[in-house]
From Swiss-Prot:
InterPro entries: CASP/CASPL, CASP_dom, CASPL. The keyword DNA-binding does not apply. Disulfide bonds: none annotated. The chain crosses the membrane at residues 47-67, 97-117, 130-150, 183-203. This is Casparian strip membrane protein 1. GO terms for biological process: cell wall organization. Residues 1-46, 118-129, 204-209 are cytoplasmic.
Length: 209
């Protein structure tokens, strides 16, 4: 080496596992937690609130139907020495089944309301929604069976059946038939609301995937 000559020594920058010194260490996690979409969250909460309102409607319809049928009774103002002409819901097993079935449906709806509230608080919770969907389907089946059977008897009471010599009793027991008909209408209103409940539950579960 000659005098006056300078020697340059290149020193590579020290590195570590996170990169060169002086650079900020990355803090990005390997697996980032998914952030729920706000639009989906709002829609699910809206469906849950609508579910709660529909359940109140089903409860009112089922209770009204059971009460109307359970209190349907009429006694004609004339009678003989041995007979008194009276019509009551407990004279027909179909109407008895109707009252029991609608009372069971109303009781189920009362028990399902807390789960509906849970779905409002936690819109993305799929467990309560699946449970409600299954139990709503069972309640809908029972409701439809009771409503259909009672509707057939009410129709027969209004029109009769000439082939079997069954007379139309509504010509004499008009108030009884009117009250029973109102109960059947209320039960079919509950059926319609149950269908909406199941539809919105399925829609909410679909959007969770």
């Amino acid at each position: 080496m000659k005098t006056g000559e300078s020697t340059a020594i290149d020193i590579a920058p020290e590195t570590n596992n996170s990169g060169p010194i002086g650079k900020k260490k990355s803090t990005t996690p390997l697996l980032a937690a998914p952030v729920p979409d706000r639009g989906t969250h709002r829609m699910k909460r809206g469906l849950a609130i609508f579910d709660f309102v529909l359940r109140i409607g089903v409860l009112a319809s089922a209770l009204a139907a059971a009460a109307a049928m359970g209190t349907s009774e009429q006694t004609l103002p004339f009678f003989t020495q041995f007979f008194q002409f009276e019509a009551s819901y407990d004279d027909l097993p179909t109407f008895q089944f109707f009252v029991v079935a609608m009372a069971v449906v109303a009781g189920y709806v009362v028990l399902s309301i807390p789960f509906s509230i849970v779905c409002i608080i936690r819109p993305h919770a799929a467990g309560p929604r699946v449970l409600l969907l299954i139990l709503d389907s069972v309640a809908l089946t029972l409701n439809t069976a009771a409503a259909g059977a009672a509707a057939a008897v009410v129709s027969l009471a209004h029109s009769g059946n000439s082939s079997t010599n069954w007379l139309a009793i509504c010509n004499q027991f008009g108030d009884f038939c009117q009250q029973a008909s109102g109960a059947v209408v209320g039960s079919f209103a509950a059926v319609l609301l149950f269908l909406l409940l199941i539809l919105f539950s399925a829609l909410s579960l679909k959007n969770s995937h």
